[in-house]
Amino acid sequence: SADLALGKQTFEANCAACHAGGNNSVIPDHTLRKAAMEQFLQGGFNLEAITYQVENGKGAMPAWSGTLDDDEIAAVAAYVYDQASGDKW
């Protein structure tokens, strides 16, 4: 299983500028909460869809595949999934 501590660290260092607290500073209704991801995330709310979005980006969100390594991507996707599925944002 992915490392949630690494995921949190990766999120805070790379994602929180736009997604602090599970929010979205660019498109306010496209948050990282489960209901929003079910509605807006291509592929729905699941680990694979979150991983794909992190790797490839979309719209204003950059692709992170060239910046983060595979372990960091897996960890940050697992962290986002865990936060959202547990309603922790």
Swiss-Prot record:
InterPro entries: Cyt_c-like_dom, Cyt_c-like_dom_sf, Cyt_C6, Cyt_C_IC
Annotated positions binding heme c: 15, 18-19, 61
Post-translational modification comment from the UniProt entry: Binds 1 heme c group covalently per subunit.
Any one Gene Ontology BP term: photosynthesis
Pfam families, A to Z: Cytochrome_CBB3
Keywords: Chloroplast, Electron transport, Heme, Iron, Metal-binding, Photosynthesis, Plastid, Thylakoid, Transport
Cellular compartments per GO CC: chloroplast thylakoid lumen
GO molecular function: electron transfer activity; heme binding; iron ion binding
PROSITE patterns given in the database record: CYTC
Main location: plastid
Subcellular location field: Plastid, Chloroplast thylakoid lumen
Subunit structure: Monomer.
Function summary: Functions as an electron carrier between membrane-bound cytochrome b6-f and photosystem I in oxygenic photosynthesis.
Family assignment from sequence similarity: Belongs to the cytochrome c family. PetJ subfamily.
Protein name per the record: Cytochrome c6
Organism annotation: Tetradesmus obliquus
